[in-house]
Structures are given as C-alpha cells and as structure tokens.
C-alpha cells in the first residue's frame, strides 16, 4: 500500500528554489535525466567489471527515450543499477542528496565517469512536468518500486511487480501556457536536437523510436516508417588520438559545430593531465565572423564535463585578445555549481584558462616562425585584436603579445616583426621610427617620412586606428623607444646642421613671428626645419596628441573636438621660402594670405580638414591671377 510522505530538507521551499531559480533554461531537464541515467548505467557496468559478472554486456546498456503525444508523457529509461525502496527514499525523497557523489567517493576509480554530483538534477523534471513517476528495480533484487510525486505535495512509494533492472522516469508534462509551449518536448525533432546539443557524447547509446517518411518500393508513394535510432555519437572527436584524426574530420567537425562554411585556418588539439586535466579542441577561423567587431559578438569556448554539454560560451576560458578562437574544453576537474549551468569562478577554471592562453600563444609563435605566409593571413584578419589586447590592458600584455605583431616596413616593402626591425637598425639609430596614415601610399608620400628615409632608416607604417594608442602603451621595444616621424624633434641633425638651422631661424625671426601671428591660435609655433627635403611645408604635432589620434578621437560618436598642437615647419631650401621672404620684404600686407595658404596646404597633406575650403580656393585663384598680370 502506498504511503504519502513529505520531502525532507525544507521540502516545499527548497523544491520551489530548485524548480524556479537554479536553472535558466527549462530544456536542461533532459540533459539532467540522461546524465542521471548514464550515472546509473556506469554503476552497473562498474559492478560487472569488479565482480566479474558475465551476464552484463555493455552493448545492452542503452538509454531509451519515448514520448506519447496523446497522454502527454515523456519517458527516460536506463538499464543501470536501479534503486530499491530505501534508495528511492534516500535519493529522491531528500533533495540535494546525491547517490552519484557518494558512489564516486566510495569507489575512487578513474575508470568510470560519474556526471551527477549534487543530487538536484532530477528535480529539474518538475520544471516541465506536473507529475513525475519513477519505476525502478535494483540489480539483484526481485521486487520493484514506483516513486510518484507532484512536487510540493510530497511523494508516494509503492511496490510494483515485473519491472526490469534499471529505472524508468515518466514525466507527465504541464499544460501549455502563453509563456511556455510544453508540446515541444513531445516533438521528435526537438528531442533529437536537445540530445545532440547536450548529451551527444554520453558514452552509452541514447535511443528512440523515430518516424521518417520513406518511398515505397516500386511506387512513387511515401509511407511513415518507425525506426529505433541512436541519437548520440558517443565518442567525442577530442577524445580520440590526434594521430588517428584526418584533417577532413577536424574541418567537418568545425564547420558543423560552429556554423562556418570555410575550413579553419588552424586546429589546436591538446590533452593535459595533472592536477587539473582537460581536453581542448580549438580552432582559428579562416575569416572573422561578420559580427566580430560588433557588440553582438560573444567570445567563449563551449564547455563540457565528462562529455556532457554545460555551456555554449564560457567566456572566462578565453582571454579578450584571443577572442577570435573558437572551440571547446572538456574537463572532469571543474567545480560546477548546483545546476551545472554556471561555473564557479574557481582555481581550476583559472588554471585551464591560463594554459589555454599559453597554448594559443605558443601555436601562433610557431606559425609565425615556420609558416610565415599563413601567419600573415592570420594577422590580416585578427591582428587588430592583438593590438587591442595591448592597448586595453594599458600595456600589461605587452610582453605576451609584442612579438606576435606585424607592421608594414617602408624600406623592406613587406610585413615585419618588431624584432626584425630592431635587428636591421642602422648603426647609430636609437629609436624605432613610425608614421601613421590610412594607406601605404599616403604614408609613403608624407613629407615627414622623407628625412628619415633619406638617412636610410626604416619607417614602420601604422594604418590601424588603434596603432598609435597601442604604441603609447608599449612605449618601447627591446629598450628602443618608438618615435613618430610627425611628432616633436627627430634629432637627426648633426651639431653643425643644428647650428646652421638655428641661424636661419634667428635671421628670419620677424618673418616667422609674422606668420605665427597671422595664424593666431591655429598653431603653437612656426619654424624652418631640416625635416623636409623636397616638400615645401608640413605640420608636426607637439608631444601631446598626434594628428592621427586627433582624427580617430574626433570620429568617435562622443568626440569632443580634440586638437593636436600644430607646429608649421617650412623647408628653408625650397623656393617657397624665398618667395615668402620676398613677399614679407616687399608686400607685407600679403603675408597673412601666404600664411593661410601654407597652413591649409599642410593640413591637406596631413589628411586633416581645412576650416574654409571656399576661402582657400579663392586665395589660390587670386594668386594665380596676380602672377599672370
């Protein structure tokens, strides 16, 4: 006779917490029930191994699913160890009491995987079921029992005859509501997709009768055929020996698992054993996803525990600077919280994340050294992320990432590393020269590049918006400071050249002051310079914000009209300087127009906008007319 009992452990309150608070997604219940079935099957298989029970054949150990649309039931059956009355009472009557955890502690065996450790997964069934019925017979026992509960009302246990060894859990699904369509769990395709998503690598066959439409023999008509189908693949690719896996298998797995049409650029398959053991299968895509640089993109690796899917985007497992890496991690050493949906941010997770970061860095370094062509393709697609890594960490990641960076060399006309630049520095060169701009062509034509190139020094081209911000955070490489050729003094002149330049500036002091006065607050200074060779004029920023930074900051949605300190430099060896001297001496009232024209010309060369394009155009026209009078 059935006896009504109440749950232990603050029954209603705790059960409500289990059902309504712990699990984010209701569909998790099927993963939990299948995991419990796998645990029960593990226990029987372990018993057969340790006690030499020949009648138990692993090939017969399956997990069977069935659904009944008419009666709105979903059933999960295992052929595992089963439970007697006391075990049903202990494991199902007491919330958060885990038989699997107890079994694992007692056996201390590495030969068996026990997934459930907290004793609450079973109760997730009540998220979708108004009533749950568990029929079970323990291995070696003649009597079976049925446990029935409608959640907070407690439970009943009664004897049931003629039960097979194992357990059958029958869920009587809730009625549909406006928020939830519980009929989804009576749809064979939805059930198949949930098994594929969460339990594909449970190492026992998960079977279900499925209906498919097939063409009749010798006829154009179709008929429904019911077949018992295995829904899971059981053996994870990452658990196999790397030597036995073909490139095609990795490629197909990646494309199927991560919804990409292209093969990955790089596969990283690693297994680590020790205090924290894990398998990782990582992929570097051939191309960035469409939303890679948008706020919609989520980084993270898929997380498995003993082959059971836990989380799709475990963001803590991958650092921001390697956010382009896709893949998964499978570990039995991670501490999972009570629902298995969210990880506790603990030491094991940190250890795995650190090792994965080092592995990715090592593989990229290897690629750079041994397969330069592929690495340059990688850097073209994802190098920006490495640069952001240094910038966003305020230079803390400099030592980790600086040797992975590539820059275009104006001298070599190809991408080079900072190490390669330093190794090829000329005798007497103490700084790493760089210039910024939108394209290689624009940078190569900058007047400021000319003086450096004239001394046979290489110039690195910075063409990404983040470059100068990153360089500011790095400060130097191998004790060699970075030097912007368009900012401050280049210190390239000899003592004799410096003295000569000082004399020219002194001799033309009143002219230069007049030009500065004409430009008022547009410039902080006007001077002659040896920086220029063939060009008449250029703008140089002071030691604050550079021109490229000005452009980037002002292009931002919250740009605040940032201005770099402008220094107008004039080439004393250019005919334009003689023309200005002549105007100043013979027609001083025109000096304002010449100053304005020179300044606007320098702005245009630098890629900066001029305040009044119409006035600029009119002044050029006036000058052309005047010259032809």
Go through the PLM ranges and name each one:
Residues 1-185, 193:
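GHKL (Bergerat-fold) ATPase N-terminal catalytic module, capturing the glycine-rich phosphate-binding loop
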């Amino acid at each position: 006779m059935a006896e009504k009992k109440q749950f232990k452990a603050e029954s209603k309150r705790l059960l409500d917490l289990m059902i309504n608070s712990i699990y984010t997604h209701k569909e998790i219940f099927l993963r939990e029930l299948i995991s419990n079935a796998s645990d029960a099957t593990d226990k029987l298989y372990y018993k057969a191994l340790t006690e030499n029970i020949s009648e138990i054949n692993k090939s017969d150990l399956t997990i069977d699913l069935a659904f009944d649309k008419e009666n709105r039931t979903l059933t999960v059956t295992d052929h595992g160890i089963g439970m007697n009355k006391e075990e049903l009472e202990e494991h199902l009557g007491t919330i958060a009491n885990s038989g699997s955890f107890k079994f694992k502690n007692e056996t201390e065996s590495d030969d068996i995987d026990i997934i459930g450790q907290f004793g609450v997964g079973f109760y997730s069934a009540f998220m979708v079921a108004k009533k749950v019925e568990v029929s079970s017979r323990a291995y070696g026992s003649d009597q079976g029992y049925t446990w029935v509960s409608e959640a907070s009302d407690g439970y009943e246990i009664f004897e049931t005859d003629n039960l097979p060894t194992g357990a059958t859990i029958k869920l009587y699904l809730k009625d549909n509501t406006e928020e939830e369509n519980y009929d989804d769990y009576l749809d064979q395709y939805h059930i198949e997709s949930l098994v594929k998503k969460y339990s594909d690598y449970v190492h026992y066959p998960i079977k279900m009768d499925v209906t498919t439409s097939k063409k009749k023999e010798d006829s154009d008509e179709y008929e429904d055929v019911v077949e018992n189908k295995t829904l899971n693949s059981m053996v994870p690719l990452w658990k196999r020996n790397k030597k036995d896996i073909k490139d095609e298998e990795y490629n197909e797995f990646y494309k199927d698992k991560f919804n990409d049409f292209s093969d990955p650029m790089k596969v990283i398959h690693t297994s680590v054993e020790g205090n924290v053991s894990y398998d990782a299968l990582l992929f570097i895509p051939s191309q960035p996803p469409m939303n890679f640089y948008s706020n919609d993109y989520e980084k993270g690796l898929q997380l498995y525990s003993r082959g059971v899917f836990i989380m799709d985007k475990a963001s803590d497992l991958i650092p921001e600077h390697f956010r382009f890496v896709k893949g998964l991690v499978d570990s039995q050493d991670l501490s999972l919280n009570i629902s298995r949906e969210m990880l506790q941010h603990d030491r094991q997770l940190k250890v795995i994340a650190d090792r994965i970061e080092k592995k990715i860095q090592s593989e990229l370094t290897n690629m750079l050294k041994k397969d330069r062509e592929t690495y340059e393709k990688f850097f073209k697609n994802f190098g920006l992320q490495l640069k952001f890594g240094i910038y966003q960490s305020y230079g803390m990641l400099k030592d980790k990432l600086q040797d992975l960076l590539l820059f275009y060399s104006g001298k070599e006309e190809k991408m080079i590393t900072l190490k390669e630049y330093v190794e090829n520095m000329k005798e007497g060169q103490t700084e790493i020269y760089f210039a910024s701009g939108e394209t290689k062509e624009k940078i190569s034509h900058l007047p400021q590049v000319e003086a450096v190139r004239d001394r046979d020094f290489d110039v690195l081209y910075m063409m990404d918006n983040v470059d100068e911000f990153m360089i500011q955070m790095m400060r130097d490489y191998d004790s060699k400071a970075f030097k912007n050729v368009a900012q401050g003094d280049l210190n390239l002149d000899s003592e004799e050249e410096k003295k000569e330049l000082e004399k020219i500036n002194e001799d033309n002091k009143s002219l230069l002051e007049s030009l500065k006065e004409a430009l008022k607050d547009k410039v902080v200074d006007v001077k002659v310079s040896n920086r220029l060779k063939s060009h008449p004029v250029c703008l140089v920023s002071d030691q604050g914000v550079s021109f490229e930074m000005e452009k980037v900051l002002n292009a931002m949605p919250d740009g605040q009209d940032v201005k770099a300190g402008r220094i107008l430099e004039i080439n004393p060896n250019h005919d334009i300087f003689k023309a200005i001297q002549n105007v100043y001496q013979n027609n001083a009232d025109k000096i304002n127009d010449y100053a304005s024209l020179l300044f606007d010309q320098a702005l245009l060369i630098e890629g900066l906008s001029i305040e009044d394009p119409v006035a600029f155009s009119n002044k050029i026209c006036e000058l052309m007319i005047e010259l032809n009078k």
